[in-house]
Amino acid sequence: SNMKLTGYMKLIAEQSVNNRVRKSAIHAVVCHLERYTPNGILLRKVDKTYLLGFIDYLKKTKQEHCKKEKTLHVNTQFYYLKTLRYCLNRAVSEDYITVNPMNKIKNEDKPKRNRTERDYLTIKELTRLVHTPFYNTLLRKAFLFSCFCGLRHCDIIALRWEDIRYDENGNALLSIIQ
């Protein structure tokens, strides 16, 4: 098949209508693949060498949206590779390729996931935030919402009205797939 890797991944993203987090993760990986290989690569040409080069690219590339020249966090690199592996596994199951080239890469050559320490706001700090005026009310409300329900920034962005249901007592229930 003459399908490009990024074209195939975009198809998977479009099929992921019920999983907006996966859809946005795939789009993020596609953006990096397009920066790594501006002319693209055919899905059937993706091999161990290409993937090792992409891993090296992820280790060295700078975050686009960040003012500081920061490289991608190792957990972001790990997540991007996990997303790419998912797409390549789909390509195998749909007979676009016969084997997932990611399986040929040793674990020591892949980014390792770090356990991150999280600091949580105290009730006193949250109360202070609630009463602090901020010029962007929508952002303020979204941040406070994430504090009270424990959603990550990317989950808040992916959140849609159809993700909220109500039980028989009228309580709002949030349906998020991570």
Language model features with spans:
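Intrinsic-disorder/low-complexity linker and hinge segments
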Residues: S1-M3, R113-N114
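Basic/aromatic-enriched alpha-helical hairpins
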Residues: N2-K68
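Residues in well-ordered alpha-helical elements
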Residues: T6, T49, K124-T127, C154, ...
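DNA-binding alpha-helical recognition surfaces that contact promoter or target DNA
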Residues: A25, G53, Y79, Y86, ...
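Alpha-helical scaffold segments in carbohydrate-active enzymes
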Residues: V29-Y36, Y57, T76-Y79, T83-S93, ...
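Hydrophobic/aromatic-lined pockets within catalytic cores
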Residues: P38, K59, Q63, N89-Y96, ...
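Basic, Lys/Arg- and aromatic-enriched nucleic-acid-binding interface segment
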Residues: T71-V74, F78-K82, S93, I97, ...
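Conserved tyrosine-mediated DNA breakage-rejoining catalytic core shared by Y-recombinases
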Residues: K104-N107, C149, A158-Q178
